[in-house]
């Protein structure tokens, strides 16, 4: 019943692969079975994995991460399902690296080590670009996680990558971890996405947008509803009905959680006239 042309692609967060190359291979296979169109993996140490906007991050050597990208690609090839592989580096803001074995990384490291045995990174800026240049040969899209929405660095990064890989797609996280209100004027915000796009950032997204939207809207609804204000629910339903004109389907919550799917199973097993079927007395069907 679904028109696949209308289904937006899903890009899955593969984190750091949850282990080594075998974990990445199997995880990619499971994502493919689930129907994703793309997966992004980051170059953090899996056992110390953290959000890209907090401290304590540890990145792994370039050669080790490339093996993970190859594991994901092999899984895709064996499955016979082409997917988009996105390489993300956290080197721009990480302070630690597991090893100085890879010469491509060692020049950016201090000789000093932490009490946990990790090497300190001295030049994050150049390391992030260098790592991404190496990753670009093995990934469809390259993403450098940053701790500020800096158009200057975004352009520098893009220029360096596209010197060697002129058609490489770049990704940018317009993260809610950034305090956008304090950093840009209204005019600058209006032009931010088009500026990024002109540099080559064709994949722009807001990580955790769903969380912030859901949390704030639920808080707003509860605040209005408290004290017996039923108009809050009416406003919500009217908002949903207006969105339905543009393809929004969430107003039918039974449908969204699989009601139609199980109804079809019930029809096959019980018959169309069974009194146990849910659609006959469904308020969702009669009122929406």
Regions found by a protein language model. Name each.
Residues 194-223, 229-263:
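Substrate-binding cleft of secreted/luminal carbohydrate-active enzymes
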